[in-house]
Structure formats: structure tokens, C-alpha cells
Amino acid sequence: MATASRKKKKVKVTPEGTVHIKASFNNIMVTITDTLGNTVSWSSAGKNGFRGSKKNTPYASQVTSEAAAKEAYDLGMRYVDVLIKGPGSGRDAAIRALQGVGLEVRSIRDITPLPHNGCRPPKRRRV
């Protein structure tokens, strides 16, 4: 016999947190965590309905950031520090979207890993 499905209880979080933005050439992923590193909300371009080459556009990045930020804002988060990783095209749009939802951005850090002459990069594209 089927039981009634329970709605997941929304837990209030601390008003401070961290936004991790990973912007690759193919996708963008936004994860919002509390001060201890526990995930509060997350979103990606694919989760928001973008497919293929549309996933790495600034607009997809904006929509993705808004979706994650709204969920975190509803749970009580107000101040965030932003960590950006990757060379993607929608890095600036993602930060503007966070501010548009109502989260106050306190600091922005670029933590893109840079090789000290490590692996050989892929060959140049010829279109």
C-alpha cells in the first residue's frame, strides 16, 4: 500500500556562505555552501534545460546562478563569498545574477588552476 509522500523539510541556514562557480568551455555549475562546506543549493546549465553549445553562453550562466541563488535566499542566506574556477564565458554574468537575486557579494576570488608548464594543451581549432 502506497504511503503519502512527505515534503522535504526546509532547514534554515546561516546567513553567510560561499558560492562555487565552475565555468568550463562546455558547461557551468554553481554550488552554494554554508561556512562549513555543506551544500545548500546547486544548479547547472543542463539542469535548467540548456543543451549542447547553449550551455556555455552568458545567458545560461545567468539563469543557472539565479536558480541556485533563489533557493539559497529562500533558506535564509544573505552574504556570500564567490570562488570562480575555469575559463568559461559566463563568469561575470553569474556574479551579476547573484546580486540581482538579493545576495550581497562580499568578495570574489579566482581559483582557476594554472599549470606551471605541465601537460601539453590541446591543438588549436581550425574552423
UniProtKB/Swiss-Prot annotation:
Superkingdom of the source? Bacteria
Q: Which residues form a coiled coil?
A: none
Q: One Pfam family, short name please? A: Ribosomal_S11
Q: Which Gene3D superfamilies match?
A: Ribosomal protein S11
Q: Does the keyword RNA-binding apply?
A: yes
State the GO CC annotations.
Answer: ribonucleoprotein complex; ribosome
Q: Which HAMAP family match?
A: Ribosomal_uS11
State the family named in the UniProt similarity comment for this chain: Belongs to the universal ribosomal protein uS11 family.
Family annotation (PANTHER family): 40S RIBOSOMAL PROTEIN S14/30S RIBOSOMAL PROTEIN S11
What this protein is called in its record is Small ribosomal subunit protein uS11
Native organism? Chlorobaculum parvum (strain DSM 263 / NCIMB 8327)
Q: Which gene encodes it?
A: rpsK
